[in-house]
Amino acid sequence: MQRRHSLKAHAAVAALAGLSALPAHAQDTIKVGILHSLSGTMAISETVLKDTVLMAIDEINAKGGVLGKKLEPVVVDIASNWPLAAEKAKQLVSQDKVAVTFGCWTSSCRKSVLPVYEEANSLLYYPVQYEGEELSKNVFYTGAAPNQQAI
């Protein structure tokens, strides 16, 4: 239960942080990118993450959205293919104009999309632990790094 509330809070913060990337004219929705493998070898792990983000978006929208605007999920399948992940990330940021993206399950995926988010000055929420020693103002690393874990 606490994890679900944490995810909802992160989604709201991410959506709010991404509002500055929106055009000045009024919009009815705030687009949220979901960048996960829904096919291929990683689908077994990442499909659940996609479902969790969709559930959080539904709950936020049921309570009035963010600043009165509904969140609109834009789901893409990166098919467990890291070069494809970079292409899909670019599509989310450039064509779909998402305010924020939740995605990737592996460090290989994160490293392949990182240049896209940094170049576009867009925001990626990375949901799992990682090896550390990487810092980007465009990524929220929500999982622990090795120096944050106790044996």
Language model: regions and residue ranges:
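Bacterial N-terminal signal peptides
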Residues: 10-21
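Sec/Tat signal peptide C-region and signal peptidase I cleavage site
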Residues: 22-26
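Extracytoplasmic "Venus flytrap"
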Residues: 33-52, 76-83, 105-108
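Signal peptide-proximal N-terminal region
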Residues: 51-73
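Short beta-strand elements in bilobed, periplasmic/extracellular small-molecule ligand-binding domains
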Residues: 66-79, 135-139
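Short, well-structured alpha-helical segments in soluble
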Residues: 74, 82-99
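Extracytoplasmic ligand/sensor domains, especially the bilobed periplasmic-binding protein
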Residues: 83, 97-151
